[in-house]
């Protein structure tokens, strides 16, 4: 997994909230999770391509949830080579760190959208339009759950 632009996962406190982002050009999925319980939940999807409204919405989420850190999914091909979106996701992670001063950690997001789509279909969301509305938030949840399962502190 690539190096994170902020502190290492060990630098996170044992307790606190994390927000995770599944970055895309048209949508950003957002999930929330807790370090203590090590559970992630889909939160919402930010729509639109303009940077200013996206960061304004993220600022509101940070104010509401008061996270101790942020996680950004980093795409790569199955063989681990960088994806076309890797540089854009890394730039987004750096912007989050620069704007908000929180630790921003990267997490491998390979196949998270495919896993989210499969989970939604299995849960009974068969209409593709309905799945599309929540797909990115569920992908962010999968990214954050993977991060919580593979990094940081031992389960209480």
UniProtKB/Swiss-Prot annotation:
Q: Does the keyword Kinase apply?
A: no
Q: Which Pfam families match?
A: RuvX
Subcellular location(s) of the protein: Cytoplasm
* EC main group: hydrolase
Q: Name one GO biological process term.
A: rRNA 5'-end processing
GO CC: one term? cytosol
Q: Which GO molecular-function terms appear in the entry?
A: nuclease activity
Functionally, this protein is described as follows: Could be a nuclease involved in processing of the 5'-end of pre-16S rRNA.
Name of the protein in its database record: Putative pre-16S rRNA nuclease
The species this protein was found in: Aromatoleum aromaticum (strain DSM 19018 / LMG 30748 / EbN1) (Azoarcus sp. (strain EbN1))
